[in-house]
Amino acid sequence: VAPMATASTTDKTGAPTTVTAEPGRFTIAVDGKTVGLIDYIDQGGRRIFPHTEVQPEYGGRGLATILVAEALDATRAAGLRIVPECSMVSGYIAKHPEYAPLVDRA
């Protein structure tokens, strides 16, 4: 399945990162290597985020934050509500209240 969309930026080390939207998940790659993902389930106008994961050797570089930000921006652009089951997503929303109006609790 071809990727739906991509966004490019850099992590805290300056390494190039790419977030790719795919059916059921967004992935993040560093220098072209996929190192993390955030799963989602679209259901009745809501996008449920149950899990975020970044490979441990890539921890501390801000990759999960980049991944969550891109996923939430794409969700907002799609007109869907956010259900933050994953603690990473909940924590990000707590620090970025601009997403709070879009949140539905599970």
Q: What is the role of each PLM region?
A:
Residues G60-A71:
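Conserved acetyl-CoA-binding loop-helix of GNAT-fold acetyltransferases
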Residues A5-R47:
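N-terminal first-folded block
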Residues F49-H51, V68-A69:
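A short alpha-helix capping/helix-coil boundary motif
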Residues V1-P3:
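Short, Lys/Arg-enriched N-terminal segments with co-localized hydrophobic residues
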Residues D73-A106:
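C-terminal structural segments of small proteins and small subunits
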Residues T52-G59:
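A short, internal acetyl-CoA/4′-phosphopantetheine-binding micro-motif in the GNAT/acyltransferase core
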Residues G24, T34, G45, V54, ...:
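A generic "binding-loop/recognition-motif" signal
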